[in-house]
Amino acid sequence: MKLYITKTPRLIQQIFKNYTWRFFTDKKEIYLTFDDGPTSEITEFVLSELKKHNAKATFFCIGKNIKNNPKIFEKIISDNHSIGNHTQNNLQGFQNLVGLNYKNEKVKANENTTYKVLKTLQENLKLFRPPYGKIKKSQAKKLRSLGFKIIMWDVLSADFDTSITNQKCLENVLKNTTNGSIIVFHDSKKATEKLKFVLPKVLEYYSKKGFVFKAIA
């Protein structure tokens, strides 16, 4: 099944240098990110584990899931984590990125759920992660003109992949993470089993090594 890379090559990062792939720092800092939430299955578990380690993270939320789980979403905010836009429905393919309807002047269409809710809770929603990392240059240009930062990653946990073991998912993170890494997890139903196994171990492992888990500003 594997059609993904767990460690983003430097060449790709250099070619698409207008996107944020990682943070260059000598400090022991890691940036955990969670896509596709909030969900009733796993997001509250994630928040609880983060709190145990005084860890901050960034949640790239889907509009429809915010609408379906408003209390959990408010908990993300009240715990002082960062919020990013992951579109309205997380549909695959350039033409289906409807959350921020990229076509013409409709780029702000995501206000129907995500942006409108966030506006009252967090003044500047300026972090965006395209579903599956797929985005056209024209789309990216339009987003940047609106002040958005496009946040990618340099470490992919692959917690969404049901064909790999929990241990392999953990190894994907531990073998590839360095200072300033942006790591992708998913607080989704599909990733629940792996995330419950991996996240506590990642938090404990790097906390013992003196790392700080930071939210993307």
Segments and roles (model prediction):
Residues C61-I66, N89, G133-K134, L156-D161, ...:
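Short histidine/acidic/glycine/proline-rich micro-motifs that form metal-
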Residues G37-E41, E105-K108, E193, F197:
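Soluble non-cytosolic domains of exported or imported proteins
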Residues L3-Q95, G99, E123, V212:
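Active-site beta->alpha N-cap acidic-glycine motif
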Residues K134, Q139-N176, G210-A217:
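His/Asp/Glu-enriched short active-site or ligand-binding loop at hydrolase and phosphoryl-transfer sites
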Residues L174, T178-A217:
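Catalytic grooves of carbohydrate-active enzymes
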Residues L47-T58, S82, L100-K137, K141-L146, ...:
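CE4/NodB-like, metal-dependent polysaccharide N-deacetylase domain
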Residues T43-E44, P70, A140, S163-N166, ...:
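Conserved strand-to-helix beginnings and helix N-cap segments that scaffold or border functional pockets
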